[in-house]
């Protein structure tokens, strides 16, 4: 793979160069190029939908985690704004509004709120990833061509496979969750000071089955920043 013949320390070509010199190393690379070209002509490489599908058991586990995650919003928000014990929705909303109004003067309040959400949502992201990849795939490595591409270093990364088959996860801008507007909404389609994780940029959708317009907008925000 790329680690053996690519420009990495202790790979085949640098060692060959040290032993036999640059001229023979150039001939070796030319020989590899011709050999790989002829191989691709007779053994075409591609990937299809079958390479990204996950089993029914993995999908069931994923839905279970998603349902559990959707309910942690109130608890995370209450913890982030310092509410202890019992609370009602109106009290929580007033606390969140006060935190929002004071966040410009006291940024730590917003940071504490974001940290609380991330701490609760990261385990959910990890649970979904471990359920779907790689054991949850219908086609396993090395028969799975997408996994083969990533693991050999040809193209793509584990993040790409995660976003295709599992979820996109928490979207962040400069290390923070997407900001909310002066109205208290992160996007016009959400309620003011909505505590749902998805209102704060947590995307439990995946590219394989599609994502919602709001999730796509959050994803575009992070992509443009990058």
Please identify what each model-predicted range represents:
Residues 100-145:
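Internal maturation/activation junctions in enzymes
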Residues 1-101, 111, 147-150, 154-226:
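Feature marking long nucleic-acid-engaging regions of large polymerase/nuclease enzymes
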């Amino acid at each position: 793979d790329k680690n053996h013949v690519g420009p990495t320390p202790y790979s085949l070509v640098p060692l060959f160069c040290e032993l036999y010199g640059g001229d023979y190393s150039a001939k070796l690379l030319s020989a590899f190029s011709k050999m790989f070209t002829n191989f691709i002509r007779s053994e075409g490489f591609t990937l299809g939908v079958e390479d990204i599908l996950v089993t029914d058991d993995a999908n069931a586990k994923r839905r279970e985690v998603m349902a559990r995650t959707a309910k942690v919003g109130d608890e995370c928000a209450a913890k982030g704004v310092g509410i202890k014990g019992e609370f009602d929705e109106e009290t929580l909303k007033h606390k969140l509004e006060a935190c929002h109004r004071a966040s410009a003067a006291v940024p730590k309040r917003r940071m504490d709120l974001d940290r609380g959400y991330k701490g609760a949502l990261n385990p959910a992201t990890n649970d979904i990833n471990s359920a779907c990849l790689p054991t949850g795939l219908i086609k396993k490595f090395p028969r799975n061509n997408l996994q083969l591409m990533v693991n050999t270093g040809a193209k793509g990364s584990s993040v790409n496979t995660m976003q295709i088959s599992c979820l996109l996860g928490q979207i962040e801008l400069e290390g923070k969750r997407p900001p909310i507007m002066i109205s208290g909404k992160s996007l016009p389609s959400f309620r003011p000071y909505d505590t749902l994780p998805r209102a704060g940029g947590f995307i439990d959708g995946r590219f394989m089955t599609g994502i919602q317009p709001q999730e796509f907008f959050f994803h575009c925000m992070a992509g443009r920043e990058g």
